[in-house]
Structures are given as C-alpha cells and as structure tokens.
C-alpha cells in the first residue's frame, strides 16, 4: 500500500487570530431541555386561548 501524504492545513489569518471559530462549544448557565421548552410554549398558548374564550373583552 502506498502512503498518502495529507495536506497540511494552514490557518488563515482570520481563524489564527481567533476571530472565527466553527467548532467552539458554548455552555450556558441555564440548561433547559427541549421538551420543557415545547411544553411551556403549549401551556402558554393554552392559557392565552382560554383567556380569550372565558374572559370578556373590556370595551
């Protein structure tokens, strides 16, 4: 088998200066699962719909 030489990746000035990074992981302080976010959105929508149905509009 022949040995393949890999190209050396050269850092561009933008990425070398730290101005642009693609694979950076950011960990926020608040961690909420997507299930809770969707559930909260459905709950808020239901409360707003119930308020429109059961509470009279003030002229």
Curated annotation (Swiss-Prot):
UniProtKB keywords: Cell membrane, Membrane, Protein transport, Translocation, Transmembrane, Transmembrane helix, Transport
Extracellular compartment segments: 54-59
Oligomer status and interactors: Component of the protein translocase complex. Heterotrimer consisting of alpha (SecY), beta (SecG) and gamma (SecE) subunits. Can form oligomers of the heterotrimer.
Record's function text: Involved in protein export. The function of the beta subunit is unknown, but it may be involved in stabilization of the trimeric complex.
Record-given protein name: Preprotein translocase subunit SecG
Alphabetized InterPro entries for the sequence: Preprot_translocase_SecG, SecG/Sec61-beta/Sbh
Compartments where located: Cell membrane
């Amino acid at each position: 088998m022949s040995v393949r030489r890999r190209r050396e990746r050269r850092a561009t000035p933008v990425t070398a200066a730290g101005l642009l990074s693609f694979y950076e992981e950011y960990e926020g302080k608040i961690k909420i699962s997507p299930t809770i976010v969707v559930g909260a959105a459905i709950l808020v929508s239901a409360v707003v719909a119930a308020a429109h149905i059961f509470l009279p509009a003030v002229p």
